[in-house]
């Protein structure tokens, strides 16, 4: 999953892809490098970030989704917590909803996901982007995350979403300490009890920088290590900002595991 941040304040890309044409070109590049799908988002969810107004988020992402749906043959995911943004993106060619709130922030999202009958990513997050990194803590890390995801799955299904359409994401970096993130990757297979595909997003995140003492622009090798470990532990989808190397890493890791 190639990530495209159409924001002026992405923790990873800054404002490199804030301009519509730059974001479209990046999507085409990621597709050419071997991405199986693209994930377009217009609201930064870095720690302590504020929500983006609806009209601004629409202005950022809809032209990008629309053009990429025409120019690339791969599925496009809309990364949003707002039902109106998701609906508009689906109308112009998106075929996946990636809701980092796990359907918690917009009560209309579950109805939309059910009616659209498209794949839906449900992510774990402790708190909100603004508060999630204020002393995150757990009594039992895996028990609490699995219980959260199962409750969100049940909520989605009660709202009409088919369970077989759901993908789960443990939310690396969303309300977790460095050690929480490392443990989640190390024991990612614990989420297999949910019986659903697992999406893992570690690309360039701050825990890598803290372990390696590297700035965001120097975190690709650390990202690659997490990709390999995640695949070995059962990740089905890897969300990445740099696809070319991750594509090779994923394919080689799969080949070794399936030999």
Where is each model-derived feature located?
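Active-site-adjacent loop and "lid" segments of alpha/beta metabolic enzymes
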Residues: 11-26, 45-75, 80-84, 90-91, ...
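Short acidic capping loops at alpha-helix termini that bridge into adjacent secondary structure
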Residues: 162-165
């Amino acid at each position: 999953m190639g990530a495209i941040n159409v924001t002026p304040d992405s923790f990873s890309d800054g404002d490199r892809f804030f301009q519509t044409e730059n974001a479209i070109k990046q999507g085409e590049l990621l597709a050419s490098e071997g991405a199986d799908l693209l994930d377009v988002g217009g609201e930064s969810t870095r720690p302590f970030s504020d929500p983006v107004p609806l009209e601004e988020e629409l202005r950022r992402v809809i032209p990008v989704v629309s053009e990429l749906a025409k120019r690339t043959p791969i599925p496009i995911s809309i990364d949003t917590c707002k039902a109106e943004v998701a609906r508009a993106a689906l109308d112009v060619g998106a075929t996946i909803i990636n809701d980092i709130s796990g359907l918690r922030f917009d009560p209309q999202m579950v109805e939309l996901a059910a009616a659209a009958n498209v794949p839906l990513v449900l992510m774990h997050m402790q708190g909100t982007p603004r508060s999630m990194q204020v002393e995150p803590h757990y009594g039992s890390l895996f028990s609490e995350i699995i219980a959260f995801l199962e409750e969100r799955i049940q909520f989605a299904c009660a709202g009409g979403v088919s369970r077989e359409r759901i993908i789960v994401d443990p939310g690396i970096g969303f309300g977790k300490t460095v050690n929480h993130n490392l443990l989640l990757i190390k024991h990612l297979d614990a989420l297999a009890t949910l019986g659903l595909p697992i999406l893992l997003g570690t690309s360039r995140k701050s825990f890598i920088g803290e372990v390696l003492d590297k700035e965001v622009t120097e975190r690709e090798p650390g990202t690659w290590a997490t990709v390999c470990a995640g695949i070995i532990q059962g990740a089905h989808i890897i969300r990445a900002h740099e696809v070319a190397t991750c594509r090779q890493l994923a394919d080689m890791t799969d080949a070794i595991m399936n030999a």
